[in-house]
């Protein structure tokens, strides 16, 4: 059995499920999952867990994400990104400066509330929102709280002859954030229709785009029996607090017994040497093995 983490660079036009399906065939391994869905048009880091590493995939999914993208001011779309149909146009504000954009972006920092876009996989009454949207139906969408730790402009404002304005941005955010919606809400705060015209995920669960592999690159390596793209399972718990345990504690964990440890964290990744051996959960002032990985 193959075990480990893959830092996959998902390409545009592919769903996250497509990527998993192709890797299952390529590696001849059924036990494969991904750590955080990317929309088909979005490129970038898609953490993949293989074999035993699938047991820690939930902790990769919960980790924060970093995205880089582009906002277009001047019109909005059905999907809130460039793939949708134009639904409204508006003239740019009489005063639109980099200082105004930067100041407005800071108002989105911290905890904010978002309404998921209709073209999303959020379920309402057992149906995904995009199913309602495709059927021409509307439904009340549940608002959700997310955290934005960074949201900044990374390029000059680019004004076009057709009364549009585009600029690049970078955002660091919590799980469940809709960056499309963030782009639309930013435009609304500036008094103009807008949409997200490009997006890539540059980091997720401690993995970065610079060290990611495309499916083509992985296929080429597999054909040469080269498996260096496979990272240790420890990468899957990189965002959890780490606790190093001794031999006695290792034995206790292997029998599923509770431990008294000097920590107040709700979850711990227990390491013995350089290897993660369990996920521990705080229960009544003690830590109970939630998942034993040895």
UniProtKB/Swiss-Prot annotation:
InterPro entries in the record: PsdUridine_synth_cat_dom_sf, PsdUridine_synth_N, tRNA_psdUridine_synth_TruB, TruB_C
GO BP, sorted A to Z: mRNA pseudouridine synthesis; tRNA pseudouridine synthesis
EC number: 5.4.99.25
Gene3D superfamilies: Pseudouridine synthase
Protein's UniProt name: tRNA pseudouridine synthase B
Active site: 39
Presence of the UniProt keyword Glycosyltransferase in the record: no
Keyword line: Isomerase, tRNA processing
GO molecular function, one term: RNA binding
SUPFAM superfamilies per record: Pseudouridine synthase
Gene name linked to the record: truB
Protein's job: Responsible for synthesis of pseudouridine from uracil-55 in the psi GC loop of transfer RNAs.
Reaction(s) catalysed (UniProt annotation): uridine(55) in tRNA = pseudouridine(55) in tRNA
Family from the record: Belongs to the pseudouridine synthase TruB family. Type 1 subfamily.
């Amino acid at each position: 059995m193959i075990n480990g983490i893959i830092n996959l660079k998902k390409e545009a036009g592919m769903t996250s499920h497509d990527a998993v399906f192709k890797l299952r065939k390529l590696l001849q391994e059924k036990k494969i999952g991904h750590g955080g869905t990317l929309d088909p048009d979005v490129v970038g880091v898609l953490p993949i867990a293989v074999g035993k590493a699938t047991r820690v995939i939930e902790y990769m999914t919960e980790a924060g994400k970093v995205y880089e993208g582009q906002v277009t001011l001047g019109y909005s779309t059905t999907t809130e990104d460039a793939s949708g149909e134009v639904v409204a146009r508006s003239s740019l504000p009489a005063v639109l400066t980099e200082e105004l954009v930067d100041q407005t972006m800071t108002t989105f920092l911290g905890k904010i509330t978002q309404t998921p876009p209709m073209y999303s996989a959020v379920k309402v009454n057992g149906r995904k929102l995009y199913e309602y949207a495709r059927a021409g139906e509307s439904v009340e969408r549940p608002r959700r709280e997310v955290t934005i730790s960074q949201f900044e402009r990374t390029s000059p404002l680019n004004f076009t002859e057709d009364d549009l304005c585009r600029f690049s941005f970078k955002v660091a955010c919590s799980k469940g954030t809709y960056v499309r919606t963030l782009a639309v809400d930013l435009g609304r705060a500036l008094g103009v229709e807008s949409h997200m015209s490009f997006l890539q995920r540059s980091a997720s669960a401690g993995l970065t785009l610079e060290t990611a592999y495309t499916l083509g690159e992985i296929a080429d390596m597999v054909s040469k029996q080269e498996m260096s793209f496979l990272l240790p399972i420890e990468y899957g718990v990189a965002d959890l607090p780490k606790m190093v345990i001794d031999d006695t504690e290792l034995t206790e964990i292997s029998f599923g017994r509770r431990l008294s440890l000097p920590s107040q964290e709700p979850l711990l990744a227990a390491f013995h040497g350089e290897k993660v051996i369990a996920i521990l959960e705080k229960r009544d002032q003690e830590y109970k093995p939630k998942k034993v990985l040895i």
